[in-house]
Amino acid sequence: MWIGVISLFPEMFRAITDYGVTGRAVKNGLLNVQCWSPRDFTHDRHRTVDDRPYGGGPGMLMMVQPLQDAIHEAKNKAGEGTKVIYLSPQGRKLDQQGVSELAANPKMILVCGRYEGIDERLIATEIDEEWSMGDYVLSGGELAAMALIDSVSRFIPGVLGHEASSAEDSFARGLLDCPHYTRPEVLAGMEVPSVLLSGNHAEIRRWRLKQSLGRTWLRRPELLESLALTDEQATLLNEFQREYRVRQHDD
């Protein structure tokens, strides 16, 4: 997968290219992240990249010419048909379904805004899609872009150490993940659930699915509203709910 990034702070993306899962993906040639800074496309000695908004008001906007030239340079590098994405609080909210859709693109260009944003005409002429990390404001698009890169890279074959890992992530099936445990068997007086020590893979699978359903019901019940549960899932969720209510009553 090739990802181009337009950012005033390209050095921030070393967190993606040099570390962790994405860093290994870059090292192994599975992920290529290339950055362009609008500052490199300025023509004044101050390398100006911001400009006043028409109509006045607080704050500045990213200057059109350097940003547009950087986008064009990235497009020329990427080739025809490459999707250009602007990270914006006004965009479609990113969820696992959206990540899966974006991961189907072998190439994409991410535009990271700064200041009060970018000229609306640039959005109309240069941007294909706008995506948001959520209903809150960041100082710039870089952190959002890094989160997007990290999430889509998990879908690249060979990036994860275990191919089943991405399929078992939270939200991969529309559900939150189940609880996980490692050594020691007893921690702060709490024991690892005995089923996980049993070696019975069918029961372990059933327990994990039940816990995943139950955790989603407790913490993100709205996710269940959009799911068509199988008979097994419905049965396990009912079991979890009954057991949970008994525990609450006993407490």
Swiss-Prot record:
Family to which the UniProt record says this protein belongs: Belongs to the RNA methyltransferase TrmD family.
Gene field: trmD
The keyword Methyltransferase is assigned to this record: yes
Known partners and oligomeric status: Homodimer.
Enzymatic reactions: guanosine(37) in tRNA + S-adenosyl-L-methionine = N(1)-methylguanosine(37) in tRNA + S-adenosyl-L-homocysteine + H(+)
Cellular localisation: Cytoplasm
Protein name, UniProt field: tRNA (guanine-N(1)-)-methyltransferase
Molecular function in Gene Ontology: tRNA (guanine(37)-N1)-methyltransferase activity
Binding sites annotated in the UniProt record for S-adenosyl-L-methionine: G113, M133, G134, D135, Y136, V137, L138
Keywords carried by this UniProt record: Cytoplasm, Methyltransferase, S-adenosyl-L-methionine, Transferase, tRNA processing
